[in-house]
């Protein structure tokens, strides 16, 4: 039975220099433990904000007080979740933008805390003391390994799974192991929104009716053979017999079928029917044209997943297309900078994720303009300490022999490991400079008239570079 409690709530206003104390009488609180968890989350988050920090700590505190708090809160009618090896943050950011522009109040973890503590923090910090989330849509990015914990107590109404790749060997092992972990997060009542072009992801739709599929038709850049150092689509994930492909878009993503068990690419409701990199236009379902502000196949899939999710919840396709055509990602994965007299583009590629790196280098080469490339590998991960660099051998660095790349700068603690990896390619060693001292190397680069620069690194090393450059206004077409 609901009880009434007299409560003194302390609310810290980080925009002022004082503390506001409000005395409230909270009615219809179903659980004092839930209330205390929400209060602790709100107060700790405000304290962290006052000192300029954001973290998942408020969620950790709340879960200590009330471990099942996520099963007690009242969620919005629409709960959209996104997981997968790549594209989570960008897809969530685009969905949030489109939905907000359409008039919906969206609660989402834009700080990127995507494990259960971060998910708990974003939910509780945006709900009443009675446990009602104050939004029309709850939009959650979830780490693929921890989704099973985040969704133990509630089911997303719509669950997008983008892709599954080799990623962070120390933490994730093999993608088939990650597949099993994600599988545990899927609830019967959730509508799945799946990438039909990924043979591993498409397995989640087996024997399920409530599935929406998205994918891409054959394009000019599609190939009849696997690209990259390895092919994780060589064998069927269902029966382990050899897989056949009609075409590949990249890595193991494409149109596939198994002659032994029948596992194949599913028909899609949301389809990229044309990608024109020259004009920078992607066409969905033969009708909706979207301007590509970042001309990468990764971005095409992120846009498609966003389009599918927003369309499913009732937003008009023309509205979605118009908004995506004018929105540039704010997540810090693509930045414009100036280093000395040289202008450049900063690109995030997750360390330990070979597919992400391959796509970034493919983007640089596709631009086909004279440039120099800076690759920084200093700290492999933000989450754990490791010197394990076998993943370097999964990346197709051989493509960097392209004539448009005039010089390569290898920086950071693992620069010599990368130099060894490059020695097994056809790259001219004369255009490679190795320097483990990042600040000193950047000072040297700043003093040279190199022209266009590209810098490729991960979040763990991002600030080591950005602290030495001047950020400039993002260009529409990078």
Where are these regions (language model features)?
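Phosphate-binding loop of NTP-binding sites
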Residues: 9-15, 21-215, 222-235
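Adenine nucleotide phosphate-binding catalytic loops in nucleotide-utilizing enzymes
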Residues: 215-355
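Residue-level signal for inorganic ion chemistry
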Residues: 82, 162, 193, 302, ...
């Amino acid at each position: 039975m609901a009880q009434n409690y007299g409560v003194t709530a302390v609310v810290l206003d980080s925009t002022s220099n004082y503390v506001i104390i409000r005395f409230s009488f909270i009615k219809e609180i179903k659980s004092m433990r839930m209330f205390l968890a929400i209060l602790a989350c709100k107060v700790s988050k405000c304290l962290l904000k006052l000192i300029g920090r954001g973290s998942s700590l408020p969620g950790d505190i709340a879960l200590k007080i009330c471990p099942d708090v996520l099963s007690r809160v009242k969620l919005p009618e629409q709960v959209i979740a996104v997981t997968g090896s790549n594209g989570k943050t960008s897809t969530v950011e685009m969905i949030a933008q489109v939905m907000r522009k359409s008039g919906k109040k969206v609660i989402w973890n834009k700080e990127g805390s995507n494990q259960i503590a971060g998910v708990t923090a974003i939910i509780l910090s945006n709900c009443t003391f009675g446990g009602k989330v104050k939004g029309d849509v709850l939009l959650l990015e979830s780490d693929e390994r921890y989704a099973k914990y985040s969704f133990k107590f509630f089911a997303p109404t719509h669950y997008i799974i983008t892709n599954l790749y080799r990623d962070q060997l120390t933490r994730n092992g093999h993608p088939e192991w990650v597949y099993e972990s994600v599988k545990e997060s899927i609830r019967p009542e959730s509508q799945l929104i799946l990438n039909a072009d990924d043979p591993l992801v498409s397995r989640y739709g087996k024997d399920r009716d409530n599935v929406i599929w998205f994918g891409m038709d054959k394009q000019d850049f599609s190939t009849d053979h696997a690209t990259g150092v390895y092919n994780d689509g060589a064998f069927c994930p269902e029966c382990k017999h050899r897989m056949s492909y009609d075409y590949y878009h990249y890595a193991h993503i494409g149109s596939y079928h198994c002659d032994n068990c029948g596992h194949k690419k599913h028909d899609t409701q949301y389809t990229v029917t044309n990608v024109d990199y020259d004009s920078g236009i992607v066409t969905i379902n033969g009708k909706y044209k979207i301007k590509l502000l970042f001309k990468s196949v990764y971005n095409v899939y992120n846009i498609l997943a966003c389009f599918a999710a927003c369309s499913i919840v009732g937003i008009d396709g023309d509205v979605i297309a118009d908004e995506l055509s004018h929105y540039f990602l704010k997540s810090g994965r693509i930045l414009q900078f100036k280093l000395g007299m040289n202008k450049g583009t900063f690109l995030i590629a997750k360390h330990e994720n070979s597919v992400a790196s391959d796509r970034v280098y493919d983007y640089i080469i596709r631009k086909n303009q004279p440039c120099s490339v800076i690759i920084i590998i200093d700290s492999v991960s933000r989450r754990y300490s490791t010197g394990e660099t076998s993943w370097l051998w999964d990346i197709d660095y051989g493509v960097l022999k392209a004539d448009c790349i005039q010089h390569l700068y290898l920086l950071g603690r693992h620069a010599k490991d990368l130099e060894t990896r490059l020695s097994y390619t056809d790259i001219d060693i004369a255009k490679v400079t190795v320097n483990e001292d990042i600040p000193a190397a950047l000072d040297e680069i700043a003093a040279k008239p190199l022209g266009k620069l590209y810098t490729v690194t991960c979040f763990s090393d991002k600030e080591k570079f950005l602290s030495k450059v001047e950020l400039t206004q993002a260009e529409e077409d990078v």
